[in-house]
């Protein structure tokens, strides 16, 4: 309904007029879309087998804009039969992530209709990968995604595979020791880029060690200028001989030189250089009479000194805190930025529970090797936690992962306290804030040779005073001629380990404690209580094409 307005001027003229504000149509706006949502119970189960150390997919699902997912995970895990009731801890960890579609395919938004220019193409299809010769094998990444195995030339969408690699790169890879795995956003892909991956070991004294004292070059004090080299002795040198031919220690370049043939202390730059004479230099020629005149060098200012200290501090903080952008924000600024804001997989939730070991005593003797009351064991774990509730605003993928890990215990090293020799090897408050100190090789793998005192990695100053390592002694040592190491999961190295990609990969020695080693070590029965509210009708009724 139009409202009639009159102004003072209009009243004088006796004329009314319509408001221009109400005559305008809002061409800059479009009608708001009201999409009704419906609730769907999408609960389901999963039964699978897997090995320890690996990141194993247990859930993969498409997410729509407007979805709200409420998920609860109930897991029952059974371990393969144990030879002994192990005295160690095993844990089952679960992780759930959301990966936006646009992070794993560069043309997704264009396929949906987005254009940089009016004539840009929007004709795209989802990227795919094709099964290799013989098809994907059981217990492969594709198998755990629910794709049929042993079928050649089977073509499937590539995005979940890319999500898996991206999650590994961002969340489970040690950026100081491991290269990122293959990842592409392009339209084409290769199935060879994707395999089951091991998570990194949880951090302790050794696994959190740095490969260098700081993440960057060593900071040097900025001395300036050139220091001339002068001589306090007299030698004779044939002009055709270059300086480097007589002094291999000098690496720089220069012209042919000769020493003064006079009683004066002429030095390098004197005009009294001798240009003839003997064919060979005297045998006593050496570098000892040479020295650098530092009086010509520019001194370091206080500000340069301060700057060098702060740059060193920056490199040390970068080494400790990490240099992924989210790590930089947290380490340097104390800011926790949401994963979605930083264009990375978003962690939704997860959980962890322990596997319980139960003793099985033998009740009848079969032979001398297996007497009555001989102990074996079985191990199971159960949990009902680790879910999440989340509303989503864009297309993407929901990825769930499971992993089994063990406590990290070392048995071949020498505790640092046994190697202290001077007062400066002890703790002193004066030195508490010095830079990183070296972890010696003998702390993780003692050999009794020169390698023992070389650096394995670098840890914070006096870190050995801040924790106490678990120990393995007696016949439990794996190095004993007749070890009882089937009772525990301590690490055993066949040679000196290095702080490397191989060292940081989680690989608990479960093979050592199970009765059958060539079958999967863990059996999983999972139930996902999954309720989704989606922008969809409860039923699709034919004929209601103009309704939603």
Which sequence ranges carry the predicted segments?
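Intrinsically disordered, low-complexity segments
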Residues: 1-548
């Amino acid at each position: 309904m139009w409202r009639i307005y009159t102004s003072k001027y209009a009243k004088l003229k006796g004329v009314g007029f319509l408001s221009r504000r109400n005559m305008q149509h809002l061409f800059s706006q479009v009608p708001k879309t009201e999409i009704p949502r419906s609730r769907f119970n999408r609960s389901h189960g999963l039964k699978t087998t897997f090995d320890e150390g690996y990141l194993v997919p247990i859930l993969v699902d498409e997410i729509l804009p407007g979805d709200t997912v409420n998920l609860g995970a109930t897991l029952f895990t059974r371990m393969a039969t144990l030879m002994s009731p192990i005295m160690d801890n095993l844990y089952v960890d679960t992780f759930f992530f959301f990966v936006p579609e646009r992070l794993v395919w560069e043309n997704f938004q264009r396929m949906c209709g987005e254009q940089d220019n009016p004539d840009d193409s929007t004709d795209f299809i989802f990227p795919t990968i094709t099964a290799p010769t013989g098809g994907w094998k059981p217990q492969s990444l594709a198998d755990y995604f629910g794709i049929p195995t042993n079928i050649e030339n089977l073509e499937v969408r590539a995005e979940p595979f890319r999500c898996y690699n991206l999650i590994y790169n961002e969340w489970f890879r040690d950026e100081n020791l491991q290269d990122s795995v293959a990842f592409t956003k392009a339209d084409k892909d290769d199935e060879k880029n994707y395999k089951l991956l091991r998570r990194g070991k949880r951090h302790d004294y050794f696994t959190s060690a740095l490969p260098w004292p700081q993440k960057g070059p060593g900071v040097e004090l900025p001395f300036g200028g050139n220091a001339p080299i002068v001589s306090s002795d007299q030698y004779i040198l044939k002009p055709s001989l270059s300086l480097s031919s007589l002094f291999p220690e000098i690496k720089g370049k220069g012209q042919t030189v000769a020493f003064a043939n006079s009683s004066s202390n002429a030095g390098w730059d004197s005009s009294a250089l001798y240009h003839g004479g003997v064919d060979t230099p005297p045998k006593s020629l050496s570098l000892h009479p040479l020295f650098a005149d530092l009086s010509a060098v520019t001194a370091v200012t206080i500000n340069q000194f301060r700057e060098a200290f702060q740059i060193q501090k920056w490199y040390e903080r970068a080494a400790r805190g990490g240099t992924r952008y989210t790590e930089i924000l947290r380490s340097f600024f104390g800011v926790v930025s949401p994963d979605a804001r930083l264009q990375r997989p978003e962690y939704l939730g997860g959980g962890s529970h322990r596997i319980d070991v139960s003793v099985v005593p033998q009740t009848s003797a079969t032979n001398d090797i297996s007497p009555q009351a001989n102990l074996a064991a079985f191990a199971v774990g159960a949990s009902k936690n680790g879910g999440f509730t989340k509303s989503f605003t864009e297309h993407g993928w929901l990825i769930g992962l499971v992993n089994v890990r063990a406590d990290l215990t070392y048995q071949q090293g020498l505790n640092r306290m046994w190697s202290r020799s001077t007062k400066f090897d002890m703790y002193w408050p004066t030195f508490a804030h010095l830079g990183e100190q070296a972890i010696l090789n003998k702390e993780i793998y003692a050999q009794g040779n020169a390698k023992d005192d070389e650096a394995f990695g670098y840890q914070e100053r006096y870190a050995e005073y801040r924790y106490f390592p678990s120990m393995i002694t007696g016949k439990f040592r794996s190095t004993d001629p007749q070890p009882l190491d089937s009772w525990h999961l301590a690490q055993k190295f066949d040679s000196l380990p290095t702080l490397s990609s191989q060292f940081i990969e989680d690989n608990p020695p479960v093979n050592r404690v199970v009765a059958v080693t060539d079958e999967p070590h863990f059996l999983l029965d999972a139930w996902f209580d999954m309720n989704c509210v989606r922008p969809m009708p409860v039923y699709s009724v034919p004929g209601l094409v103009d309704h939603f």
